Amino acid sequence: MTPIQKTATVGGKDILLETGKVAKQAHGSVWVRLGDSIVLVTAVSAAEKKEGIDFFPLTVDYQEKLFAAGRVPGSFFRREGRPTEKETLTSRLVDRSCRPLFAEGYSNETQVIATVISFDQENDTDVLALTGASAALHISDIPFGGPIAGVRVARVGGQLVANPTLAQRAEADLDVVMAASRDAIVMVEGGAQEVSEAVMIEALLFGQAAVQPLLDAQDALRAATGNKARRAFEPPKNDVELRAKVKALTWEKVKEAYGRNEKHDRYGRLSEIKKELLQALKDEAAGDAAKLATIALREKEIKGYYEDVKYDYMRKMITDERRRIGGRGMADIRKITCEVGLLPRVHGSSLFTRGETQALVATTLGTAEDEQRVEMLTGMVFKKFMLHYNFPPFSVGEVKFLRSPGRREIGHGALAERALRAVMPPEDQFPYTVRVVSDIMESNGSSSMASVCGGCLSLMDAGVPIKAPVAGIAMGLIKEGEKIAILSDILGDEDHLGDMDFKVCGTAAGITSIQMDIKIGGVTRDILEQALAQAAEGRKHILGEMAKALSAPRGSISAYAPRITTIKIRPERIKDIIGPGGKTIKDITARTGTSINIEDDGSVSIASPNQDKVEEAIKMIRGLTQEAEVGRIYLGTVRKIAEFGAFVEIFPGTDGLIHISELSDKRVKSVSDVLSEGEEVMVKVISVDRSGKIRLSRKEALADSAKKSEGTEPPKGEPAK
């Protein structure tokens, strides 16, 4: 096959789509290039459907090869290891964008693999993987309803930019990744520095317009490859008569069940209704072996119709009756309770409860040694702020093996981390490494948003001087014709009902994090404005409830947290603190029990829960690095006597010379007449030459001291006051 190329211009830069050159045995293979960043994306789907499942078995894997950036992996085996957080999050982005577009009922195992094979240190590859996944599926025979395309939108200096460089992203106050089709925004994930809802909507519409050339390029690529026919598959059964019978037998019962407020009571009743349905159908067929056998064979189909009844009833209840589970209105928030400081030995803690969703959140303050080190294409990255989300099975009354965090937990943690990172203090004001851990105690929807709220309270309880409190809210939107219902603080039951599910986090001033999944077209600017405005009202209500427990960061950190003090030294004196083979710094840390971190710019951070030990370490470091200051008086020790003068140590490691003429205002015949080795003597620094040689004067020190009414001597090795 001759390679085929199509180009689209986005944000003033060309994006190349190419197929037919590599990975030709995949059902769809596309090479996506922006600048010198290249991602190879392949799509393959099994020939036969997977039996016994009620979901679409799609797997998306995004992987970054370090050779793409000219790097050798730093692991022992010099191979790429387990997926990094970025790889996991990008895999989720692609999955969330593409999954809703596959044909309903298609159940063949499908795998999309996106591999970064070249990285130019300027153009990020996640949006290339997103576009490439759509393109690879679009040119294949897999029943995919694309195309869609990905774009990153940033606001730099007040201007919206499509697919910004890494340097531009560092200056941006808004940074979102989104996927869009011709008539809809499909997926949004990103963060911001407290931007308004209007700015966010402007960015989303800007991004949707920006991807249109990429959609044209994908259609052109499909046409050039022969417009492969979509493979045939067995569509889901739709027995109209049986569907109607299931509805008749269950509708009123479902209506009664959804009137129950308590989650387990409601779920228990809905499960009973399903059993009653199957039994009713069996009773109706009693005595007819063939009918009974048919019911047994079609049990999965019957259960599917029952799920449709639940889905249809809840949407009708919301759009027609304007009523929700528990009798809540569209914008009502469940009851909120907050508690802080409940874990006595933890640096900061909170318990945030909203309805039947609860998060226990702990904050730990650490030093620079506790930073997370992550090897990425851009090099080694050091993270000083982390939020980890855990979802144990007991939170929903289930029994499961405890394993390492899955993609969902990593994704929820990243969303909450992004929401709070926007208000974290700069490192020069708060030099701590901060880890927040959210353990979900119980869940009935919006557990990631409970982690945001609980995380904020936990940070404030720990004394972290955040810029402003942050809250998060999960929202849903249902659109039936002209009827629109926007739901605030959705339950687990409502989570899958919506045509648009979105989570918005932020302060009272603006948005710090957003996540959206939109399943339909026709979501206009007006609808987006209504949805985000209602989310803002809900967010402000939650912030008010949080303020009742703790309205601002505590004035001091926990007694059990390390005290970090940062001092500055001249970079050329770093070697004096470290010593040969690290001997000196090891001695200081051993004697004081502190943790010491030295930056290349001369910043020295000393940490210990005991402030006295910190001060002791600082004194030792000052003694090693302080420099003689002209005009200052020091109390030194005579180290050596010579005919022409005396050498005096004014502080550890630093000597100066008192010439014989500077010993006294009277004539001195011999230095030993005035000084002796080991004697302490007041001296004044009168000059320091370019080579660092220090000239001292005893007579000027005596004269200056005589003028002072207090007549006090300075401590040894320190300037006179």
From Swiss-Prot:
E.C. numbers: 2.7.7.8
Subcellular location(s): the record lists:
Cytoplasm
Source organism superkingdom: Bacteria
Gene Ontology, cellular component aspect: cytosol
Positions that bind Mg(2+): 495, 501
> Does this entry carry the keyword Zinc?
no
According to its UniProt record, which reaction does this protein catalyse?
A: RNA(n+1) + phosphate = RNA(n) + a ribonucleoside 5'-diphosphate
Q: Which SMART domains match?
A: KH, S1
What Gene Ontology terms describe what this protein does at the molecular function level?
Answer: 3'-5'-RNA exonuclease activity; magnesium ion binding; polyribonucleotide nucleotidyltransferase activity; RNA binding
Keyword field: Cytoplasm, Magnesium, Metal-binding, Nucleotidyltransferase, RNA-binding, Transferase
**Which cofactors are named for this entry?**
Mg(2+)
Q: What is its main location?
A: cytoplasm
Q: Report any one BP term from Gene Ontology.
A: RNA processing
Q: What class of enzyme is it?
A: transferase
- Give every KH domain span: 562-621
Please give the Gene3D superfamilies that the UniProt record associates with this protein: GHMP Kinase, N-terminal domain (3.30.230.70), K Homology domain, type 1 (3.30.1370.10), Nucleic acid-binding proteins (2.40.50.140)
Chain intervals for the UniProt region annotation (Disordered): 699-721
Q: Where is the S1 motif domain?
A: 631-699
Function, in words: Involved in mRNA degradation. Catalyzes the phosphorolysis of single-stranded polyribonucleotides processively in the 3'- to 5'-direction.
- Identify its protein family: Belongs to the polyribonucleotide nucleotidyltransferase family.
Q: Which PANTHER family match?
A: POLYRIBONUCLEOTIDE NUCLEOTIDYLTRANSFERASE (PTHR11252), POLYRIBONUCLEOTIDE NUCLEOTIDYLTRANSFERASE 1, MITOCHONDRIAL (PTHR11252:SF0)
This protein's name:
Polyribonucleotide nucleotidyltransferase
Q: Which organism is it from?
A: Anaeromyxobacter dehalogenans (strain 2CP-1 / ATCC BAA-258)
Supply the gene name.
pnp
